[in-house]
């Protein structure tokens, strides 16, 4: 879900 911690 594109955050600095997740690219999902």
From Swiss-Prot:
An example GO biological process term is: defense response
Keyword Secreted on this protein? yes
Function noted in UniProt: Produces in vitro relaxation of rat arterial smooth muscle and constriction of intestinal smooth muscle. May target bradykinin receptors (BDKRB).
The cysteines joined by S-S bonds are: none
Is Phosphoprotein there in the keyword field? no
Q: Where is this site: Not sulfated?
A: 8
Species of the source: Physalaemus signifer
Domain of life the protein comes from:
Eukaryota
The subcellular location is:
Secreted
Name a GO CC annotation attached to this entry.
Answer: extracellular region
Where is it made, tissue-wise? Expressed by the skin glands.
Per the record, the similarity remark reads: Belongs to the bradykinin-related peptide family.
UniProt protein name: Des-Arg1,Pro2,Pro3-[Thr6]-phyllokinin
> Under the GO molecular function aspect, what terms does this record hold?
toxin activity
């Amino acid at each position: 879900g594109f955050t600095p911690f997740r690219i999902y």
